[in-house]
């Protein structure tokens, strides 16, 4: 009888260990690296992603109030075009957004598009850094591709994009720096106009005739 009880206890311990082993191993790994992410930090990171999604929804819907609602009143902005590294304020940012609304339609952010080997658009914290290792999610890096349609010409425009956003204690964007090829957008529009404004003569499409604007039928 004692032997049976002993075996029963061993079985219970084994089952309990099996159920909790993965969690325990995770804790051990965290202790070895010194990186322990709290549930509060995880929740804060997810809230920041939701805030950025509201930001991009404001672009798509051309809703300036929705978009600016996630920006702090004292927000600072470093724009994608080089301006001597001059930091702009929230008024300048609002004016730039309004200009995009006036110039483009269907402004859409495609999360993670353009990355190689990963589709994770959002990153925070720093395990490997020139500074100190930390798990603070307040500074978030975002990667993706913006797509839109030029209102005047209907030209489709795409731009690979990278942004660094710092969130304040209220969960709003307090500092915003972004990088993209602004001049490349103008080039895409001009190329579209050049191709679609060409009027072919009666020889276009005929054998032996080379049309630089319609290489698919040459």
Name what the model sees in each region:
Residues 4-5, 20-218:
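C-terminal and inter-domain tail/linker signature
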Residues 5-11:
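Sec-dependent signal peptide hydrophobic core
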Residues 15-18:
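C-terminal motif of bacterial Sec signal peptides marking the signal peptidase cleavage site
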């Amino acid at each position: 009888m004692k032997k049976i009880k002993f075996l029963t206890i061993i079985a219970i311990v084994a089952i309990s260990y099996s159920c909790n082993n993965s969690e325990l191993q995770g804790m051990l790994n965290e202790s070895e690296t010194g990186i322990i992410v709290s549930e509060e930090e995880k929740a804060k990171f997810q809230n920041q992603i939701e805030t950025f999604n509201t930001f991009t929804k404001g672009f798509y819907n051309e809703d300036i109030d929705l978009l600016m609602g996630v920006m702090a009143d004292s927000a600072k902005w470093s724009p994608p075009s080089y301006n001597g590294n001059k930091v702009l304020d929230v008024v300048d940012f609002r004016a730039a957004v309004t200009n995009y609304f006036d110039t483009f339609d269907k402004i859409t952010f495609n999360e993670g598009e353009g990355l190689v080997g990963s589709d994770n658009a959002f990153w925070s914290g720093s395990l490997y850094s020139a500074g100190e290792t930390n798990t603070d999610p307040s500074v978030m890096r975002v990667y993706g591709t913006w797509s839109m349609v030029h209102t005047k010409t209907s030209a489709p425009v795409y731009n690979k994009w990278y942004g660094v956003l710092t969130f304040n204690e209220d969960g709003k964007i307090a500092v915003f720096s972004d990088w993209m090829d602004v001049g490349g957008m103008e080039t895409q529009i001009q190329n579209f106009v050049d191709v679609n404004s060409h009027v072919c003569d009666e020889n276009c499409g005929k054998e032996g005739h080379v049309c630089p604007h319609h290489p698919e039928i040459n």
